[in-house]
Amino acid sequence: MKQKAIYPGTFDPFTNGHLDVLERALTIFEEVIVVIAENSQKRALFSIEERKMMTEQIVSNVDGARVEVLAHGLLANYARDVGARAIVRGVRQVKDFEYEFQMSLLNRQLCPEITTVFLMPNVKYTYVASSIIKEVAMLGGDVSNFVHPIVLSMINDKRALCER
């Protein structure tokens, strides 16, 4: 049986840190589905369709990875429905872990057969967050070391629209 996991997030935008966690997950699982979800508590720069498109382009050459959208519903149920055995979460710092630990316990109550796997990114990405990338980029800062060129181009396009 093929070992499958999901890697959920808003990915607004998908960063090199996200890619690093995905690649680490693929050393454990044969298939990882990057699940792009909405989060009503976050203000998105990119539409869910834009995020899916950018992420698909970035991971197109990553064996074992594919991208899906979860428009609504519980993540644990989605994981079970697609046959995933695990939910992969990137953890950069203690604050991330506290939140993710709570979510892990809730998901375990909802679907006991699904486990959560916490992966730390490469140390050079521990301070990289999508929210920081967006803020720095929209203020004209150089974020090219933290995002794929596709993302950089899309951010620059958004910034140009805002400057009009």
Curated annotation (Swiss-Prot):
Keyword Cell wall biogenesis/degradation in annotation: no
Mention any Pfam family matching this sequence. CTP_transf_like
- In which broad location class does this protein mainly occur, judging by the first location in its UniProt entry? cytoplasm
Q: Which organism is it from?
A: Chlorobium chlorochromatii (strain CaD3)
Cofactor(s) needed by this chain: Mg(2+)
Q: How is the subunit organization of this protein annotated in UniProt?
A: Homohexamer.
Instruction: Enumerate the subcellular locations listed in this protein's record, separating them with semicolons.
Output: Cytoplasm
Task: Extract the NCBIfam families matched here.
Answer: coaD_prev_kdtB (TIGR01510), cyt_tran_rel (TIGR00125)
Protein family according to the UniProt entry: Belongs to the bacterial CoaD family.
Q: Does the keyword Nucleotidyltransferase apply?
A: yes
Record field: catalytic activity: (R)-4'-phosphopantetheine + ATP + H(+) = 3'-dephospho-CoA + diphosphate
E.C. numbers: 2.7.7.3
Q: Per UniProt, which keywords does this protein have?
A: ATP-binding, Coenzyme A biosynthesis, Cytoplasm, Magnesium, Nucleotide-binding, Nucleotidyltransferase, Transferase
State the name under which the record lists this protein. Answer: Phosphopantetheine adenylyltransferase
Query: A single GO BP annotation from the record?
Result: coenzyme A biosynthetic process
Where ATP is bound, by residue? 10-11, 18, 90-92, 100, 125-131
Residues that bind substrate, according to the entry?
10, 42, 75, 89
Task: List the molecular function annotations (GO) for this entry.
Answer: ATP binding; pantetheine-phosphate adenylyltransferase activity
Q: Which CDD domains match?
A: PPAT
Pathway listed: Cofactor biosynthesis; coenzyme A biosynthesis; CoA from (R)-pantothenate: step 4/5
